[in-house]
Amino acid sequence: MRKTLPVLLLTLLFVASSAAQTFKVFHSFNFADGSSPNGDLLRDSAGNFYGTTQFGGSSNRGIVFELDAKGNETVLYTFTGGTDGGIPIGRVMRDSAGNLYGITSLGGDPTCGCGTVYKLTKSGTLKVLHSFKGGKDGAQNEAQPELGLVMVSGELYGPASFGGVSGCDGNLGCGVLFKVTQSGKETVLHRFTGQAEGAFPQDLISDQAGNIYGATGGSYMQGNAGTLFKLDTTGKLTTLYTFPGGAHGYSPRWRLLRNANGVFYGVTQFGGNTSNCAVASAGCGVVFAVDAAGKEQVLHTFGKTRGGEEPSGGLLDVAGNFYGATFYGGTVNSNCKFGCGVVYIVSASGKYSVLHRFTGGTDGALPSGSLTGDASDNLYGATIAGGNGNGVIYEITP
């Protein structure tokens, strides 16, 4: 059932040290229409946005939503947590017919409840394409909100953060890469071992030739700080770069950017500076570039409380500058013990500045997911907290 709900629109103006940016709350969730939005927003050519919330709705198992260009919301589907799945994670993708595809971390197979791959038609009918069994075919987990699908020749490719080969961090399984057809047939393309090739695969990207690229988050038990990999059209996996940890970053997360020269840009959740961090021993994270020869350059090291820590989404490239958000850091107050998070910009040469520091009030707190841009260079993102207590979608004009 589709429900159209009014938007709460709040505008806040602030002045940064170098220039004035405009920040406004595009939509504030109220639990009935969703709670804790996560993952990247998808924008269509008409200016509508699509996304998911992990919680909220009538069953508190999350929803799929649409926001129009003015921020008015339509609930497209409410998950029950049963065989239809629940607690959706990551971004949705949309095909040319207007169907949406995504992943849930709960529900599906009643003996496991390990999540699903779903298709939501334009008319609002949800079809479960695959229910994970939790063994060799993989399993999803709500602690991994950064996952998503890519479509190549009409077939869906994605990561399962757990399952597959056992032996990684509490025997959760090291994760798999899979393919699901429109008819619902799943094929496991690769099972990670947690050793030199890494474990816990993250969000994926593809190139025009159909090759798949991504990162593994690393395994504490295996002593692996994460990798970048390529899966070619024959199913062969090649490790392109292995993170050494420390100052170079630990646990690359979220979707990568890859330019025409084969240079990857991304973020690590940990590593880098270990002072003034919410998880001090792990580090506050870095922004990195890895060239086609496998050489890494650290563009920015997070660490100062006011500057943000623990990147909470991938990078958005706008005219050679990279925009992103951090989960912690920024403004520390009674709402946010480790800081409410920030939106930042970093240039290709490493110049860094903060565009907005969340306060934990009506402007939101704890941003999650990558930013999405429009034709006017406005940026849109989500926070899992703040607003009415259920998170917000925000708009910022750099």
Describe the residue ranges of each PLM region:
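Extracellular beta-propeller repeat domains
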Residues: R2-P398
